[in-house]
Amino acid sequence: MTLRAPLTAAALLATASFAAQAQARPMTPEDVAQLESVGTIAVSPDGSRIAYTTASLPDVTEGEENGTTQQQLKLAYGPSNARDFLPDDISVSGVTFSPDGRMVSFTWADEDEKTAVWGIPVDGGAQRKLAAVEGAAVRSYAWSPDGSTIWMLAGAEEDEARTKQAKAGFNSVVYEEEAKLTRLFSARVGAETDAEPKAVAIPGYVSAFKVAPDGRHAVVDSAPTPQIDDAYTAKRAHVLDLTSGKVVRIVETPGKLGDIEISPDGAQLSMIAGVDMNDPAATTLHLADVAEAEGDAEAPGQALPLPLADP
């Protein structure tokens, strides 16, 4: 009696193993055409929902026209409880929630339009355009903490004369003489799209920006030009006063500049940077006080390496 139970269990395990082996098969090109991966993920402020995208290529094995990766917006409410939140032909990026959690926002280009910031209510309804920059695509964006403003990083303004030359056949690029600088804008969020978003003057080429949790400041990564040398060695953090739209401080770092984070109270910046111009990688943690030298951008503040305790 005691021997029968182990034998029965062994027989069941062997049967299950044989069944699994029978179902297993080599991966085929058709399988590759049907692969999907999770793209961006955003959690609602109250933690009740997760917005995410699934990235996939057209399934040419089923007759779909070949094309680029499509990102489908989905909303999850719990385990095994998720659904598509936009039509299949709307491929989005930059997914996040509005500060009050009532809307999922994303970037998308509608037909022949430039990429803009759109939103769709989480409780149902159609998507609508929230903010845009005329004649330029929005590359990234961020909400103000109170949800009243959207800050946008957009492409360079179109050079009509250069566009005319390109259409006539002159499409050469003059190295280091045709830098296309990104631009920073703020747009009011309301029932209608802000027709005249405000431009914020930032010197050089802006590559990234973050809004402080208190909504008073933003930190902007900017280099003199888009050239790779400047991106490596001359990029600096600019502290922006969101009320006046002016740069109040430039934080000097001695070498390469990596990730920048703002403290929860908005008082300090933490930065991964090099220790000097000869440091081949940004691997040292630096701290800088946001309030230091505030209002005097002509006297840049210095970021100090953070002393770490020995283990």
Regions found by a protein language model. Name each.
Residues A42-R49, G94-M103, S140-T149, F209-H217, ...:
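Blade-terminus and WD-like Trp-Asp/Gly-His loop motifs, strongest in beta-propeller folds
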Residues E30-Q71:
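Beta-strand-rich domains and repeat architectures in extracellular enzymes and scaffolds
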Residues T2-Q21:
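Gram-negative bacterial Sec-dependent N-terminal signal peptides
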Residues T54-Q72, L86-V92, T107-W118, A132-V138, ...:
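A flexible loop/linker signature enriched in serine peptidases of the S9 family
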